[in-house]
């Protein structure tokens, strides 16, 4: 494709705003434990998210987690998704697989939303949480880049929030899909930025952002 065909795409969307939220997508044991059939290599991703989590807490910006778990009734609700990805049945409600990795353990005032599909917005109160905090942007982290991260970034934009994706704080089991998703997000939906840019933005909010 010619450069002219890309003209008007890939403009920077404003980055981290004055009232961001940090969302940590699916850092539950089912995706981080090597014993799980759904595991990704996420150690470096978790280390990057940890830095963002510490910075977000210092700045007192909202932190929201998602996990994925399926009870018996959910297997009917999410039937089409489970048929496409049968390994999702590993994520049984009440099992250790659906608990957040202890390296990123949530605090009592940090909601953990359960989702049945890819986007953090679909079938959850995430949009209401962002509205209640008067957020203007969402720092999207976690896994997988080509699945739930991308879906959440797209839905953030569609709900009126600027999505920002720190490159080092997302991961995928497929490097090609990871790179393609980041390219796509940066071209059309949000800002893909270095981790340090997000850390600097959050440090600049210390003392200014009350929940």
Task: Locate the predicted segments by residue.
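Internal catalytic-core helix/loop-beta-alpha segment
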Residues: 94-143
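Active-site-proximal loop->helix
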Residues: 173-186
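Glycine-centered short loops/turns at secondary-structure junctions
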Residues: 58-61, 134, 160
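A short glycine-rich beta-strand->turn/loop micro-motif centered on a GG-aromatic cluster
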Residues: 139-142, 162-175
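Short acidic-hydrophobic, aromatic-tinged amphipathic segments that line or gate anion-handling sites
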Residues: 113, 190-200
């Amino acid at each position: 494709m010619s450069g002219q065909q890309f003209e008007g795409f890939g403009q920077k969307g404003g980055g981290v705003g004055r009232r961001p939220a940090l969302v940590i997508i699916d850092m539950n044991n089912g995706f981080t434990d090597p014993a799980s059939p759904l595991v990704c290599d996420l150690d470096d991703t978790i280390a990057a998210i940890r830095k963002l989590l510490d910075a977000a807490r210092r700045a007192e910006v909202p932190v929201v987690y998602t996990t994925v778990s399926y009870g018996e009734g959910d297997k009917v609700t999410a039937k089409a998704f489970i048929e496409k990805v049968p390994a999702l049945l590993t994520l049984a409600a009440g099992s250790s697989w659906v608990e957040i990795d202890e390296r990123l353990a949530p605090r009592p005032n940090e909601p953990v939303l359960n989702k049945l599909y890819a986007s953090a917005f679909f079938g959850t109160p995430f949009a209401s949480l962002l509205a209640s905090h008067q957020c203007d942007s969402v720092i999207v982290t976690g896994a997988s880049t080509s699945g739930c991260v991308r879906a959440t970034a797209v839905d953030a934009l569609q709900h009126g929030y600027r999505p920002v994706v720190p490159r080092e704080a997302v991961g995928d089991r497929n490097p090609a899909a990871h790179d393609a998703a980041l390219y796509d997000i940066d071209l059309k939906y949000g800002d893909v930025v270095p981790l340090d840019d997000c850390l600097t933005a959050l440090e600049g909010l210390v003392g200014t952002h009350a929940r």
